[in-house]
Design a protein with these regions (language model features):
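Blade-edge motifs of beta-propeller repeat domains
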Residues: 16, 47, 183-207, 239-256, ...
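An edge-strand/N-cap motif at the start of beta-rich repeat modules
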Residues: 169-174, 179-218, 223-227, 247, ...
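Beta-propeller blade termini
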Residues: 210-219, 259-268, 309-316, 357-364, ...
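Acidic carboxylate motifs that coordinate Ca2+ or other divalent cations, activating on Asp/Glu
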Residues: 220, 224, 269, 273, ...
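Short glycine/acidic-enriched loop and turn motifs that connect beta-strands
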Residues: 231-233, 280-282, 330-332, 378-380, ...
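Blade-level signature of beta-propeller repeat domains, shared across WD40, Kelch, NHL, RCC1
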Residues: 509-542
Length: 679
């Protein structure tokens, strides 16, 4: 604020001198802090799993702050120490309380900026500490022909400590002891991953479950389920006791047609809240968790223009709070609700004139902002992506004209860009669209066998062989006879083979594919809308099939031992399997061919081994335990007599034995004289 010289006069007419300038800055913007972590040298990503005993935390504020202290930091599953810093940068050490899920968060109103604006909450940092190395578990088995051994590990494993790479033959080593068999090589001759199977169990029977979401709602280190029971007008959650036994609890009731839920810490206070789109009431709600799983209903929008169809939560505008994307039916619009950091929301349009399924929000073009991929329905269904210009203004781009179903976005062919996996309901196809790196897409077929109305798609490494597989649920409206959940095994070159998870469900409209039982492989949980049931499918690992070669034939008393080689097999946290294991031995099958020699006299009476008779000749029978084509009279050694009239094939041969004089005789076949068909 300034007054220039000569702008006014006093009563005598003298002009004023320049005023002393008054300078002032208005700042009504609340500060916030971003939480990041390293293991001391390498960055640790939010929502990751590592084996670090501690994390080095950095708290970076968007401006200088005051009053920020160690007591402002909220945690579960661990504690902070060694806090220091000033201005806009602070550090601390986080130590987990055990091998478990952990979280670090900063609630609102705990510190201020220089003008004394109270802080906003921070996006929590979630991390799992895992120091348990993978082990070989029970179930090691041998093929009948001694050519392969199958070993199962306690968790999903990789060839590198960065959580990537399929296992190789050099990651295992063999040894053998006892018997006559010997190994041609201590290294497996081949390695392949056997397909998993799925064991299903019914979790609950809510009335009209529209979907199921999975989260550790009570922060007790296991996965719980959130279910909107549409026909019962209630939102339920199912508490896991840690052994996949579930107890039903209530989130909220008295709502007309809950269609979708999304669990997230919306108010950034360290516990899990739930956002929900309500179909009949046309409401957008969130349920605030008090930290003890008692929920208070909060209204975001009580007058949606259409029926609430889906919702998801993400920091769409990158301002360190959580916004909400909502799709509605009958008015055909897609909107996002901008959070001001205090859970007060402003509605913004993404697009109108179309209905849509739940969008995938991802930086598809990798330009630093969040785009959307979705199915739109406006007289002709289309697969589109909506490009964000960086200011949350979206431009529609067509991917394909195929009809609707579930979709996922992932780098399926692992070439460094995002592809789209989707279903074409009219043609009964499951497709994937390869991105050329510039968001131009080429359609490829995964399944064209008639999967009608594919309501949900899942993607991930289901069989643990290092590539991305696909799962799909068919919800046909024709009853349980036509409905199913299947998965498609990727051979590593995006050629897929279908396997069945479940048939006989009644409209499995939605499922999730994630680790539910804590063994780091991908299980499933499904919601059957018409069948009124929630089912859990445990992924039962098929194991690794290791080929081996023997240089000498075993007699059945050999012990074959298989162990990981040193620093070769890792879990996702980076723990290496030990070179010394249990449950890692098998006894080889006897592959030596036995030969039984029997005799009868001229009256066809048996002559026993070691007996004395006055028979002038014996008819001798040679019976092999396996068919042979190269057993000949020359393979038989005799003393005290001679063989004649030798004949036979397969496993049975005969000859006539004539002694040369009174006295002892022998008839024998030495080891290694002949072979079976396999050599």
């Amino acid at each position: 604020i300034d007054v220039a010289a000569g702008t006014f006069t006093d009563a005598s007419g003298y002009s004023n001198a320049a005023a002393t300038q008054f300078n002032w800055t208005y700042d009504g913007t609340s500060p916030y802090v971003a939480i990041t972590a390293t293991d001391g040298s390498n960055a640790v990503a939010n929502n990751s799993i590592t084996n670090d005993e501690t994390l080095s935390l950095t708290f970076t504020a968007n401006e200088s702050v005051t009053g920020f202290a160690i007591g402002d930091i909220g945690t579960f599953g661990g504690s902070v120490s060694s806090f220091s810093g000033s201005g806009s940068s602070y550090t601390a050490t986080f130590t987990p309380s055990g091998e478990r899920n952990t979280g670090i968060y900063l609630p609102t109103n705990t510190y201020t900026d220089i003008p004394t604006n109270n802080n906003l909450g921070s996006i929590p940092f979630y991390w799992r500490y895992d120091a348990t190395a993978p082990t070989i578990v029970s179930g090691t088995s041998l093929s009948s022909d001694n050519s392969t051994v199958t070993v199962k590990l306690s968790e999903l494993v990789y060839d590198t400590n960065s959580g990537s790479g399929a296992l190789e033959v050099g990651d295992f080593a063999f040894s053998i002891s006892g018997g006559l068999g010997t190994l041609a090589s201590a290294t497996p001759t081949s390695i392949s991953k056997a397909n998993p199977s799925f064991t299903d169990s019914q979790v609950a029977t809510p009335d009209g479950p529209q979907s199921v979401r999975t989260v550790d709602l009570d922060l007790d280190n296991d996965m719980d389920f959130i279910v909107p029971a549409f026909d019962d007008d209630i939102i339920l959650w199912y508490e896991n006791n840690g052994s996949q036994s579930f107890t039903q609890r209530t989130v909220g009731s008295g709502i007309d047609g809950p269609k979708e839920t999304y669990p997230v810490d919306l108010d950034l206070d360290g516990d899990m809240d739930i956002v929900s789109a309500i179909y009949n009431d046309k409401d957008l709600l969130w349920y605030e968790n008090d930290g003890s799983q008692s929920f208070t209903k909060r209204t975001i929008d009580a007058s949606l223009a259409g029926n609430g169809n889906h919702c998801m939560v993400v920091d769409l505008d990158g301002d360190n709070d959580l916004d909400i994307v909502v799709g509605t039916l009958n008015d055909n619009s897609l909107s996002w609700y901008e959070n001001d950091g205090s859970q007060s929301f402003t509605k913004n349009s993404i697009g109108t004139g179309f209905a849509s399924n739940l969008p995938v929000v991802i930086d598809l073009d990798e330009d630093g902002d969040l785009d959307m991929v979705m199915r739109t329905f406006e007289g002709g269904e289309k697969l589109r992506w909506f490009e964000n210009n960086g200011s949350e203004s979206f431009t529609q781009n067509l991917i394909d004209n195929s009809n609707g179903g579930g979709l996922k976005v992932i780098d399926l062919d692992e070439d460094g860009d995002y592809d789209v996996v989707s279903a074409d309901g009219n043609n009964g196809h499951v497709n994937w669209f390869a991105n050329n790196g510039s968001e131009s897409f080429t359609k490829n077929t995964i399944d064209n066998s008639g999967m009608s109305n594919v309501a949900c798609i899942g993607v991930g490494d289901i069989d643990g062989d290092g590539d991305i597989d696909v799962a799909a649920a068919q919800a046909s409206f024709n009853g349980a006879a036509d409905d199913k959940i299947v998965w498609y095994a990727n051979n590593g070159s995006e050629s897929f083979t279908e396997y069945t998870v479940e048939t006989g469900l009644n409209y499995p409209g939605q499922f999730e594919l994630l680790d539910i039982d804590g063994d780091k492989d991908l299980d499933m949980v499904s919601a059957a809308r018409q069948g009124d049931e929630i089912k859990f499918y445990e992924n039962v690992d098929g194991g690794y099939v290791l080929g081996f070669s023997l240089s000498a034939t075993p007699n059945g008393s050999e012990t074959l031992t298989v162990n990981p080689t040193s620093s070769a097999i890792f879990d996702v946290a980076g723990n290496a399997a030990s070179t010394s294991q249990s449950n890692n031995t098998v006894t080889l099958n006897n592959q030596r061919i036995s030969m039984a020699i029997t005799a009868v006299n001229g009256s066809s009476s048996a002559v026993s081994d070691g007996s004395t008779t006055n028979d002038a000749t014996l008819t001798v029978t040679f019976t092999s335990s396996a068919a042979t084509t190269n057993f000949a009279v020359g393979d038989v050694t005799v003393s005290g007599g001679a063989l004649s009239s030798f004949s036979g094939s397969g496993t049975n041969y005969t000859a006539t034995f004539t002694p040369t004089a009174d006295g002892a005789t022998t008839i024998d076949v030495a080891a290694g004289a002949f072979t079976d068909a396999s050599g």
